Regions:
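Short, conserved, surface-exposed binding loops centered on an aromatic residue
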Residues: 16-18, 66-69, 93
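Short, small-residue-biased leader/transition segments that mark boundaries at the very start
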Residues: 2-9
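Catalytic/RNA-binding core of pseudouridine synthases
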Residues: 10-20, 24-38, 46-49, 88, ...
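Helical lid/core segments from catalytic subdomains that handle acyl or acyl-like groups
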Residues: 28-85
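A common structural junction motif
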Residues: 61, 138-145
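A generic structural signal for well-ordered coil/turn residues at beta-strand boundaries
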Residues: 5, 22, 71-73, 95-97, ...
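Intrinsically disordered, low-complexity linker/assembly segments
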Residues: 86-120, 124-126, 131-139
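Short amphipathic alpha-helical segments
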Residues: 1, 45-49, 130, 134
């Protein structure tokens, strides 16, 4: 089963959209010192997703050209690794209406390492139960790494 089995319908303003595929938007530093963006297709196989992620992020970092998928529903992400953070709030502007996942640095403790994340979603797209199911599945996958 896919990590996002329940997110095929998304509401935007007064319209409801159905998408056949989903992608994760990733932001990467590029060789010019700026930021570039790519959309990595969601798939059931974590190794395939990772290979696609590595290829796309290396490409956009080197070429400074965004690689975006206009036909997929996009889940935004952001790795703010230059700092520690607990949350990012109010990301709802024109381009951030879909679910949004962000994180900062790992926090290394004496007995464990943690990575706090911030997950936002709009209730027109999913309910709290769906968000909790997503986070539980994400934690399950992280526990296998």
């Amino acid at each position: 089963s896919t990590l996002f089995p329940y997110t095929t319908l998304f509401r935007s303003r007064d319209k409801l959209y159905r998408y056949d595929r989903m992608a994760i938007n990733v932001i990467a530093d590029n060789v010019k010192g700026g930021l570039s963006f790519c959309d990595v297709a969601v798939c059931d196989d974590l190794e395939t997703f990772n290979a696609n992620y590595m290829h796309l992020t290396e490409t956009i970092s080197r070429t400074c050209q965004d690689i975006l998928d206009d036909e997929a529903v996009i889940v935004g992400t952001s790795a703010v690794t230059g700092t520690e953070l607990d949350s990012i709030t109010n990301q709802y502007s024109g381009i951030f209406n879909n679910p949004f996942l962000a994180w900062g640095r790992y926090r290394k403790g004496w007995l464990k390492t943690t990575l706090p994340i911030s997950f936002q979603f709009h209730h027109a797209q999913m309910d709290g139960k769906h968000a909790a199911r997503f986070l539980e599945e994400l934690q399950r996958i992280v526990n296998t790494i």
